[in-house]
Each structure stands twice: as structure tokens, then as C-alpha cells.
């Protein structure tokens, strides 16, 4: 079960969190999650953290974050790279290990500094005798480029939209609602249960407290988004406004055996249910969250109508629209407090963020079923059922 969790505010690309590494952010989230759970670091038996952009991050980013968070040196850690699925897969793996009897208490989550992703110089080890050399953007190539079709994932999504036929207006309206819902959630204090402020040192004077997601624009409307140019094709429908933001952040949860939590007298947010993992038939993204949700709820033994809370990562508006339609659910149940279009999408973090948010939303409601799902690079999808 998920006992508690915490996340940093999400920073924009080269924004307020640009000077924090992924491991710095991960440590902040882990430390805060332990505090919220009222669990001492000495009780943690294993740490699993997702991170996608690891070039230049140093060995074992998960272990770096764990040690920086005060978790003892004799506690092992595992770094996961399953692209956008990394954070949710970390939680699912933690659940599986606990069910297998390997551990009782695991920290799981995801961390990412997209701002600090370096540029790479391929073939530099063998040297360049003459002429120019080309730098490769680690962020773009290893984070946002579909290797199977050799194009940006946005272009791939645009290509699939020729089949799905979601209009520019539909995507702009969805994106605007994401911002409006997220802004309203912040105003109503919804995110206060999950976000821990980050103290940012200044050259002079006291540190600044960075406390709210940086990318949310409360005044965003479909009309204002209509003025943006297509991002991936001249006649395309996807813009920077209907795609998730490139961002920095981290999230962590405390996953614990139920008997252990009861022994310690702890409350919990939600029990972890079935996990759905899907892939194919190609590298497109739109159907993957829906496919993963269908697999997970079938394993859980429930129907889609029994889901009270549905979190679908907004990699693109087209993905959330397609998966919502394929599930046949009321759109009002999906991403009730906004999503990655407004909040941002630090790729290693997002799976953990939406799982934590779904658990907290379920706890606020008192009972029911929730599911968190994402698409992932290479045409994969993960979903995790939560119940209370």
C-alpha cells in the first residue's frame, strides 16, 4: 500500500529548478515523503527511483538521492529507465517485491532534471581528424525522439492523429481545461497535501521558497492557444500548447506491507491493486494508457464504470483524448485537477506524480477505485489500480 508521498513543485525548462540535479530533487521528495509517512529513514529497506536522462548524472542516481535524503548506506537502491513509465513502474515493482516477501518498506518514485540534460559528442573517444563535429542533445534524442520511426514523439503523435482525427480545436480546448483545472486546484489547496516547497539559495539574501508548479497559466483559453503555430507539421494540429511541458521535478511514495503499517499504527492513502503493462503494435502513444487500464482493471476484477478517479498522463492532448474515448468513460472523471500539459512532464517523475495524486484524491473521497496510466516511448503503456 501507499502510506504517504510527496513531490516537489514542477519547474519549467531552465526555470526555478534549473540548478538542481535530478538526484537533488529526488532527495527532497524522498525526505518529505518519509516525514509525511512518519517513517524514519532507518526503517527503509530498499529504494527504487526512475530517471531517464542519466548522462552526466553520475553512477546510480537512485542511490545518490537515497543517501542525500538520509537513508542509511546499507540500504540498496535501483535506478529505473522505462522512459515516461519509470516512476509508475518503480511503484509497481516495489509492490511486487513486498508481495513476494522480500521487503516490508520501500521508497519508490521518480526524478528528473530535463534542464540539466547535457549535449553529447558521439565518436569523440576515437577522435575527429578533420572537419566539424555534431553535438547530440541528450534531452531531445534520449528523451523525446522515437528511435523506431526516427522522428520526435510529437511528430509521431501528429502522424497517428491523421487516423484518430482529433481536431485542433478539440486539442486546444482540452489543453486550456488542463490549465484551468490545475489553477483551480492550487487555489483550492488541493495540491497542498503533496507538494513540498524547495528552498532556492540566492547570491545575496535569504533563500526563495519555490512552492507552486511553474507552468500553470490560469488565464489560458482555447482562443489564446488557437494563435500558436503547429509544432511538428505545417498543417498539423499539435502545438506547444497542447503538448506536455519540458520540466524538472521529483516525486516519491512510501510503499509498505499492510501488516507492517498496522503494526506501526500508521494510516495509509490507498492499497495498490493490479498492474497492467502493454506494448505495440507499433510505437504510437495514443492507445497505450487505455490499453494498460483495460488490462489492469481486468486483473483487478472490476469494470471501467467502477473507476472513481482516472489519471492519464497528458503527454499530448491527443493521447488523453484518444484513451478517454477508447475507454468510454466520462471525461469529467479524467485528470480532475489538470495534468502534464499544465503542470509539466519531468519524464522520470510523472508516473510517480500521477500515482501519488490519484492515491491522495482517493483518500480525500474516502473510498473507491482509482487508476493511474501513462504512455511511454517505443509504444508502451503502464497502469496501476489503487483502491480504498
Swiss-Prot record:
Reaction(s) this enzyme catalyzes, per UniProt: 2 acetyl-CoA = acetoacetyl-CoA + CoA
Covalent link (Isoglutamyl lysine isopeptide (Lys-Gln) (interchain with Q-Cter in protein Pup)) residue numbers: 187
EC number(s) recorded for this UniProt protein: 2.3.1.9
TM segment ranges: none
Principal EC category: transferase
Cystines in this chain: none
Keywords: Acyltransferase, Isopeptide bond, Transferase, Ubl conjugation
InterPro entries the UniProt entry points to: Thiolase, Thiolase-like, Thiolase_acyl_enz_int_AS, Thiolase_AS, Thiolase_C, Thiolase_CS, Thiolase_N
Active site (UniProt): 84 (acyl-thioester intermediate), 345 (proton acceptor), 375 (proton acceptor)
SUPFAM superfamilies: Thiolase-like
Gene3D superfamilies (UniProt xref): 3.40.47.10
PROSITE patterns in the cross-refs: THIOLASE_1, THIOLASE_2, THIOLASE_3
MF (Gene Ontology): acetyl-CoA C-acetyltransferase activity
PANTHER family for the chain: ACETYL-COA ACETYLTRANSFERASE, CYTOSOLIC (PTHR18919:SF107), ACETYL-COA C-ACYLTRANSFERASE (PTHR18919)
Family according to the record: Belongs to the thiolase-like superfamily. Thiolase family.
Identification of the protein by name: Probable acetyl-CoA acetyltransferase
